[in-house]
Amino acid sequence: MDASTLEALKILRKADVPVMLTLAPEMVPGDTIRQIVDMGVVVSAGHTNGTTAEAKAGLDAGISCFTHLYNAMPPMTSREPGVVGTAIGSDAFVGIIVDGHHVTWEMVGIAWRARPKRDRMFLVSDAMSTIGGPDHFELYGEQIEVRDGALVNAAGSLAGAHIDMVGCLANLVQQVGVPLEEAIRAACVVPADVMGRAAPNLGSGTPLPELLALDKDLKRISL
């Protein structure tokens, strides 16, 4: 975590811009994490090789969220819960990609049911430019393309997701079996809670562009 990053965070927060920062807790000292949290930045653990102890130390320092559970973090084992197990067992917010490629339906369900507070789970699309655009793009010099519904590089490794939030919502209900009301909260309300923002409030006068209408099969319909 260099000085220029800290300065950028200060500038954004001084302008009252909501900021979430994903970091690897084993790479950033606890005092620095506390400093960032004190700025009003939401700090999330992710893209990490951290151990259980390092993940817990990050929580103690003020980390309040985990980025796309299971992905870009070591797998949980019977002797080393790691970041995954720490996230599931914590009261922190946890995001998860529900596209069937990043995480199997069964593993989504296990995490969802195991959380001590299920209203701390939220959906992440991890969508890339193929949603509404061409089926390929370049990222860090690599060609990324849609293959069998997944976004992959030439080696077949995942590189973002080819799904939007409505698709994640439908999968959570239809494939994982989460109740619709709970799934809607995970898509619309909990993300606002993560950032400390007011939850969406639908009512008379709500601008049409802020609304989505879905049919009984959770497919988007025109308003």
Where are these regions (language model features)?
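Conserved phosphate-binding/catalytic loop of the ribokinase/pfkB sugar-kinase fold
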Residues: 1-14
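Acidic, metal/ion-coordinating pockets
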Residues: 14-16, 25-34, 38-41
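Small/polar glycine-rich anion-binding or flexible loop at a beta-alpha turn
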Residues: 184-193, 204-208
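Active-site-adjacent C-terminal substructures of enzyme catalytic domains
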Residues: 32-36, 42-45, 50, 54-182, ...
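C-terminal cap of metal-dependent C-N hydrolases
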Residues: 198-223
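Acidic (Asp/Glu)-rich catalytic clusters
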Residues: 12-16, 59-60
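Short beta->alpha linker loops
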Residues: 27, 49-50, 187
